Design a protein with these regions (language model features):
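Pyridoxal 5′-phosphate
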Residues: 1-369
Length: 369
């Protein structure tokens, strides 16, 4: 199988990730619930990953909260910062993991920057959204649909200058682009463990620049006499038993990235994305590709996108088609009615993947514009 759906989850995990998970299941009990060797091994496994994440993202280990996925972390962050009916500035490329929690809070959503790959438009409209009285901001680092890398450093500076607290959705950038909690000055940065960080499904990280409000309450192994959640990190946001085998795999994924280098992986992904986009353009497809591009390409063939993905799947190629849980992004790009076929490269991106994909894509009909 040629796997080109890394925007959904990384696949073909590194061997050390799988080994770490198997070892954890063989050696670890429950962390923070006992002083016997298997419990201590579990606690050490969790702390080791917390330390690695702190190094990776430039923060203290205590600021690293483990979640079940990026959506979980975003919900914690949004319910901490956004009050019911509050005004929130977002980009024009947000995932439903951002917009649905905001909708549930009855927030007034101010959408900024609807032009693909246009930093000037993004920054101008984001500045206008902040100036119109935004109480908070939430924005993605990279569009999950189009691979558009947003100018988050400048957006973060605008928020800091106006005293607007903000959340960064690093679902498509963690493990692929540099992300630093102190450099950005974010209140929270949410990310999955199973995408660019190469960990397993069911893992995620929330970097906390402030104390979050608990989304769940329960046992933490600390301050058990109290009926309130602890008022310190990370315990305040980690109720219940942690996913220790998953956290072990996440640690191994970050170690792999540190050894290989995220810049090297990004360059390989971007190179294949460009080759893919150029090849699709030669075939006559409608392709979305621009200057500020990660390792993802979206295109519209001359047929139903889901049908095109099924044809590719029968040829052993895994891509994703449809709206990708991001209707705001499709509205911005004018593809809300059609959706797109998304090709997203991963840490093992190479020429063969692109070549085989383009050979199969050549069998798809071309859209008449």
């Amino acid at each position: 199988m040629i796997y080109l759906d890394n925007g959904a989850t990384s696949f073909h995990k590194p061997q050390n990730v799988r080994r770490a998970m198997v070892e954890a299941m063989a050696r670890c009990a429950n962390p923070g619930r006992g002083g016997y060797p298997a419990a201590m091994e579990a606690a050490n496994t969790v702390f080791r990953c917390r330390e690695e994440a702190g190094k990776f993202f430039g923060c203290d280990p205590e600021q690293v909260v483990f979640t079940s996925n990026c959506t979980h972390g975003l919900n914690i962050a949004i319910h901490t910062l956004v009050k019911p009916g509050g005004k929130v500035a977002v980009s024009g490329f947000e995932h439903n993991a951002v917009t649905r929690p905001l909708h549930g809070l009855g927030a007034e959503i101010k959408v900024a920057g609807r032009k693909l790959f246009d930093w000037d438009n993004t920054l101008q409209e984001f500045d206008e959204a902040l100036s119109s009285g935004a109480d908070a901001a939430v924005f993605t680092h990279v569009s999950n649909v189009f691979g558009y890398i947003l100018p988050v450093e400048e957006m973060a500076r605008m928020c800091r200058d106006r005293g607007v607290p903000f959340i960064l959705d690093a679902a498509q950038s963690a493990g692929m682009l540099p992300v630093s909690l102190p450099d950005l000055g974010a209140e929270f940065i949410a990310m999955p463990g199973h995408k660019g960080l190469l960990g397993p499904q069911g893992t995620g990280i929330l970097l906390c620049g402030r104390l979050p409000e608990p989304l769940m309450a329960g046992g933490t192994g600390s301050e058990s006499i109290r009926q309130e959640m602890p008022d310190f990190l990370p315990d305040r946001a980690e109720a219940g038993t942690l996913n220790v085998p998953g956290i072990a795999g996440l640690w191994a994924g970050m170690r792999y990235l540190r050894r290989v280098g995220i810049i090297n992986i990004l360059k390989a992904e971007q190179r294949q994305a460009r080759r893919c986009a150029e090849g699709l353009q030669k075939l006559g497809m409608q392709v979305f590709f621009g200057e500020h591009q990660a390792g993802t390409v979206s295109f519209v063939p001359g047929m139903d996108c889901e049908g095109a993905a099924e044809i590719l799947a029968r040829r052993g190629i895994a891509v994703r088609a449809g709206l990708h849980c991001a209707p705001f992004a499709h509205e911005s790009a004018g593809t809300l009615e059609t959706g797109t076929v998304r090709v997203s490269f991963g840490h093992d991106a190479d020429d063969r993947q692109t070549q085989v994909f383009l050979q199969a894509a050549a069998k798809l009909p071309v859209r008449s514009l």
